[in-house]
Amino acid sequence: MTEPTQPQAAVAADENQIVAERRDKLRALRDQGIAYPNDFQPTHHAAGLQTEYADADKEALDAKALDVAVAGRMMLKRVMGKASFATVQDGSGQIQFFVTPADVGAETYDAFKKWDLGDIVAARGVLFRTNKGELSVKCTELRLLAKALRPLPDKFHGLADQETRYRQRYVDLIVTPETRATFRARTKAIASIRKFMSDADFMEVETPMLHPIPGGAAAKPFVTHHNALDMQMFLRIAPELYLKRLIVGGFERVFEINRNFRNEGVSPRHNPEFTMMEFYAAYTDYRWLMDFTERLIRQAAVDALGTATIRYQGRELDLAKPFHRLTITQAIQKYAPNYTDGQLSDDAFLRGELKRLGVDVTQPAFLNAGIGALQLALFEETAEAQLWEPTFIIDYPIEVSPLARESDTVAGITERFELFVTGREIANGFSELNDPEDQAARFRKQVEQKDAGDEEAMFFDADYIRALEYGMPPTGGCGIGIDRLVMLLTDSPTIRDVLLFPHLRRED
């Protein structure tokens, strides 16, 4: 473990001294029998008071004499002889307490002067406006509800260390308004999506998190063991195959918002545990899905932010405009126009070009790759990162789309799309393959790839084939990455910024 630097050691020593002093204060409270009371009920919240009485002047407030009870964390304290002020932050915002010994009593006032920033405090009093115009609570009763033993970060610098922000999210939420705003926007976006789906007659369902066979995506699963059944289980990588079983069962529109788990790397776009929404609608296809997904994302932005025009990393993005649609080769030639049609159909050229771009074409996934898979790999290297405006990339090759319906007009191509915004995949959808014999053949091909060393290739799911053999209506299905969508809406450069508790290395 790395030894702390001299400044770090000094800070730690100072903090230890502060904690020791605060523990002494807590010990005194315990001796008095008033350490952690639990009998205070707020009648108002800071933001509600600030909003409702924003335009009320001092005379109007004095005439109204509104009694309030407010509780929260003390973020700032100014002791000024016979009158003191405290800025208190609750879950909605901040409001000022005005404290005098004449109003709360000399004993309470003396105790208040010893309270620390970070303490949870409560007051009853009358709402008024100070001579400087600050909306405040003139306290007639003041109590300490919970003692903070650890000091808050310096109010001018906050949490400067990014990893500490993620590791101690509870502190980050206390001191960083932008973090609180991000997660409120996330909640609004998800609520918007749920309402949008309900209004479109979708039924929300829950499917298993523990799978006997991982499926529904090309990914490496987490493996666990069920002791009572003595069987290997997998944390789900996707709910797709279970949701389509429900389509077979007669639920014609279903969706699920829940966690997926993939035992893969961590990056600004990837976390091993992440939130997805998948939805399936009978008697639809990928064209319907694209239109529906576009409207859903636009509405989520409006409900979360109040507008469909957003800013991401300094650039404006108008989600109200129609989303673009390009095939894989069209996208390559738009952003790398030197490639000819002939080159993009030449196996040897594509492999050579991928190698030149730093792709390891000897890995198992490339050993038997066809033209379509090679084109997709080239797209990922040359075009994907440049898809700033919302763009549906359509018509994916069948060899990388084992669950998607093949095109009726172009051999080797499926009715599949992926949606990219700001160079990042947000959604993936397709007309579902509902032919059980074709699906079984594709599963067998996936098993061959897995046997050849491709860890992300799919397993053969015999029960899913059995479900298809009962007959599944024509269906469209789509998955939307909720975390990546929230990144977009909140101008967050990394997925860790939109996860309350992202995965990190152990502290030791």
Swiss-Prot record:
Its cofactor is Mg(2+). Its main location: cytoplasm. GO terms for biological process: lysyl-tRNA aminoacylation. It catalyses: tRNA(Lys) + L-lysine + ATP = L-lysyl-tRNA(Lys) + AMP + diphosphate. Mg(2+) 2 binds at residue 425. Mg(2+) 1 binds at residues 418, 425. It is an enzyme of class 6 (ligase). One of its GO terms (cellular component) is cytosol. Its EC number is 6.1.1.6. It is found in: Cytoplasm. GO terms for molecular function: ATP binding; lysine-tRNA ligase activity; magnesium ion binding; tRNA binding. Keywords: Aminoacyl-tRNA synthetase, ATP-binding, Cytoplasm, Ligase, Magnesium, Metal-binding, Nucleotide-binding, Protein biosynthesis. Binds 3 Mg(2+) ions per subunit. Homodimer. Belongs to the class-II aminoacyl-tRNA synthetase family. This is Lysine--tRNA ligase. The lineage of its organism: Bacteria, Pseudomonadati, Pseudomonadota, Betaproteobacteria, Burkholderiales. The gene is lysS.
